Curated annotation (Swiss-Prot):
GO molecular function, one term: electron transfer activity
Subunit structure: Homodimer.
Keywords carried by this UniProt record: Electron transport, Heme, Iron, Metal-binding, Transport
Matches recorded under PANTHER family: CBB3-TYPE CYTOCHROME C OXIDASE SUBUNIT FIXP, CYTOCHROME C4
Source organism of the structure: Halomonas halodenitrificans (strain ATCC 12084 / NCIMB 8669) (Paracoccus halodenitrificans)
Coiled coil regions, renumbered to chain: none
Protein residues bound to heme c: C14, C17, H18, M63
Modification(s) after translation: Binds 1 heme c group covalently per subunit.
Protein name: Cytochrome c-554(548)
One Pfam family it belongs to: Cytochrom_C
InterPro entries: Cyt_c-like_dom, Cyt_c-like_dom_sf, Cyt_C_IC, Cytochrome_c_Oxidase_Subunit
Length: 83
C-alpha cells in the first residue's frame, strides 16, 4: 500500500489536469477523488508500461513514464484518500 502523505509531494505533474483534490479540471480529465487505490495504481502502471492505449493514453503515458512503482502507489493512495 502506498503512503498518502508521501504521495502529496509527488503529484506535481498530476495537478495540471486532475487538481490537488483529484477533481478533473476539464470534462476529459477523470475525477480521481475517492477512487480505489488499487484501481488507480493499476491504471497508472498500465499507462506507464504502454499496456493502456486509446483515450487519454497519449497524454497519460508520458506523464507516467518517469514514475517508480513506489511513486505510483503513493500517488494512488493520496488521491484515493481525498474526499
Amino acid at each position: 500500500a502506498g503512503d498518502a502523505a508521501a504521495g502529496e509531494d509527488k503529484i506535481g505533474t498530476c495537478v495540471a489536469c486532475h487538481g490537488t483534490d483529484g477533481q478533473g479540471l476539464a470534462p476529459i480529465y477523470p475525477n480521481l477523488t475517492g477512487q480505489s487505490a488499487t484501481y488507480l495504481e493499476s491504471s497508472i502502471k498500465a499507462y506507464r508500461d504502454g499496456q493502456r492505449k486509446g483515450g487519454n493514453a497519449a497524454l497519460m503515458t508520458p506523464m507516467a513514464q518517469g514514475l517508480s512503482d513506489e511513486d505510483i502507489a503513493d500517488i494512488a493512495a493520496y488521491y484515493s484518500s481525498q474526499e
